[in-house]
Amino acid sequence: MNIVSKELFQHMVRIRRQIHKHPELGYQEENTAAIITEELKRLGIKATAGIAKTGVVARIDTKQTGPVVALRADMDAIAIQEETGLEFASEVKGVMHACGHDGHVAMLIGAAAILKQSLKTGNVILVFQPAEEGEGGAQKIMESGLLE
């Protein structure tokens, strides 16, 4: 069963490339958080921004008893100069998404779109974690209490 439409896939690619062009270091992911929040809003998913400074947490709640699952994507880029020559290469000097976090964000937004339409029972918590690259973002997400 193919549940990822061509349109959703293309939208995920656009999101990934947009984030890739404008990478942000740990705890500076404000533009990335705004993109995430807007995309989730478009899907009808309420998100809480500013978690662990620049993180975003959202919940897909079916109102039906079932398992609670958390899905996580890291958001931050690293301090390295991109020299790929890609049309969507980083426009920020000395900062790049070399670890794929731009793709992780796009994929979690895509998963959210699918789950919002297909989840029948239980809940899914969507965690967009800042500062994964050694800056303690995961600990700050845990301390926020939003995963309780």
Annotated model-derived regions:
Residues 99-101:
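Membrane-interface loop-to-helix entry segments
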Residues 103-148:
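Acidic/histidine-rich catalytic neighborhood of metal-dependent amide-processing enzymes
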Residues 2-97, 106, 110-121:
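Acidic/His- and Gly-rich active-site-bordering loop/insert found
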